[in-house]
């Protein structure tokens, strides 16, 4: 987190137009992601302990890619427009806990429907990196500047699970 912030500050202080896109809770059908991990673990276990007190917006990588394409088209056409320069957030609409996200993944996929999900507090799941309890980002500035809305995370997850990995 600190190195990302330092990089953002350096870019902002350069005195030229810039575009920084922030996102969070990214998942995909490819690579290492919470979605793939939950599906795999559900196929191997009868019960999963999932953190239920961290809140964020699950965001499909494809949703980010599509939004980034729209943003770049507008930015490149209007680079000198001050409202299109700066830091912008790109996360799906809505919010969930990791437990809620896992529950939705299993309900929409062919993963084991018999796997029980046990909600646990963050304190019961220590990790090397400290994770914020509340990590929602507001898309208001992005929506106003670039005139678009990110999809709701439920809708993006349905589309992701029903899509074929490319």
Identify the function of each model-found stretch.
Residues 17-19, 47-49, 86, 116-118, ...:
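Conserved beta-strand segments of alpha/beta enzyme cores
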Residues 3:
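Active-site helix of classical SDR
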Residues 10-57, 62-70:
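NAD(P)-dependent short-chain dehydrogenase/reductase
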Residues 87, 97-103, 120-160, 165:
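Conserved C-terminal active-site "lid" loop/helix of NAD(P)H-dependent oxidoreductases
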Residues 6:
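Active-site His/Glu-centered metal-binding helix of metallohydrolases
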Residues 67, 74-128:
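Mid/C-terminal beta-alpha module of Rossmann-like enzyme folds, strongest
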Residues 19, 48, 57, 94, ...:
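Residues that recognize and position ribonucleotide moieties
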Residues 22-23, 51, 92, 121, ...:
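A secondary-structure boundary/capping signal
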